[in-house]
Amino acid sequence: MKKRLLIVDDEPSIGLILEHYFSKEYDVVVKANGHEAMSWLQEGNFIDCIVADFEMPLMNGLDFIRQLQVSTLYKNIPLLMLSGKDETSTKILCLKHGADDYIVKPFNPEELDIRIKNMLKKIKI
């Protein structure tokens, strides 16, 4: 059975590229912002890993992390943040609040895949 990957990004092109790249290996779900993603999760949908953008409308990446962290259902789901910000302070903020990894746009999909696999390996231990 395929692992389910949730992509949360307000740039439709990012969602399409990642869905295309990962669909052979993962069951990919794409949502446009943190609010939409949280609503989908709260409907009872299960996810194995989340890749979310930092800068999004309605609910930004940091607020999305905070929402995940207050829930016993979601706080242990591996979470990788994407961002166009290559600032140490932003990376530290995301990691400090519960993100497991952080990658800067533009990124190499192969590197993203390796990071996702590494996060998923850790939850098997």
In which residue ranges do the predicted regions lie?
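Acidic, metal-coordinating helix/loop segments flanking the phosphotransfer/catalytic sites
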Residues: A32-C49
